[in-house]
Amino acid sequence: MLKERPAWANNHSAYARNHNSNPHMMPTTKTTPMVRSEHPIDPTVRERIIAEIDAIERAHGVQVLYACESGSRGWGFASPDSDYDVRFLYVHPLDWYLRVEPQRDVIEKPIDDELDVSGWELRKALQLLHRSNPTLLEWLNSPVVYRQDAHIMSDLRGLAPSFFYPIKGRHHYLSMAKKNFRGYLQDETVRYKKYLYVLRPLLAVRWIDAGKGMPPMRFAELVAGTVDDHALLSEIDELLAIKMRAGEAEYGPRRPAIHAFIEAMLAEADHDPQYKQPQGDPADLDRFLHRVVCG
């Protein structure tokens, strides 16, 4: 049974530490200098996003349980011209789940110059959680939340860690890092944002290999938990400053310290440690789905 949606927080502050933040994120222990991190959400765009979510609910007859930012605004290093990557989870009324033929389980809005909006149906999301899908796990820990059913999402986040399989996360992030490094960082002049698109997944691999569990979505938190070299931290922070003040297409000469670190990390990560299978029980996901759909 679909429940009435609670009143949603509507704070427009730019930083992840305030009410735009996901309240379920673990706090970062500051043992080394922190790199900069900003999550700018224009109040006018936020209102437009909420209006889009409302329109999706009306057009498709669904309830959006959760909507968050999934791209650079969630990672904490958006450029002035970065778009908004909005991702959401939704549930249908009970009748939808009682049909013999499979139904479409994705909703996608046409991409425009500002918004990229798409979402997954809850059963699909739970199937992906059972398979330890890193993308879904990142969504659940986004520091920028546009809407959520607090009770349902608290329960879902409580289930998620038991389904995290380190080797799957490791393969996902290492593949992402290699693809971006080989595709964009081989010339003497490089697109600076691609450094961050390699550093983020490589540090996620380091986080996993350190036994810390699912890597955080916030890049600053990821750096704080995996990098303690002050010179390297300064290099990363300078790279972030360039990314945040320049456009998405900013090019410049290679940054030798960052480049050397990436090459060393790729060599270091090119192995498969032994990890235990996740201990999550799929019956818990079945019960969760039943509770949300049937009330």
Identify what each model region corresponds to:
Residues 276-295:
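Acidic, carboxylate-rich catalytic segments that either coordinate divalent cations
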Residues 71-112:
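Catalytic metal-binding acidic patch
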Residues 154-281:
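Conserved nucleotidyltransferase catalytic core and NTase-mimicking acidic/glycine-rich helix/loop elements
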Residues 27-68:
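Helical scaffold of the NTase/Pol beta-like nucleotidyltransferase catalytic core
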Residues 1, 25-26:
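Methionine residue identity
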Residues 13-16, 20:
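Short hydrophobic alpha-helical segments enriched in small aliphatic residues
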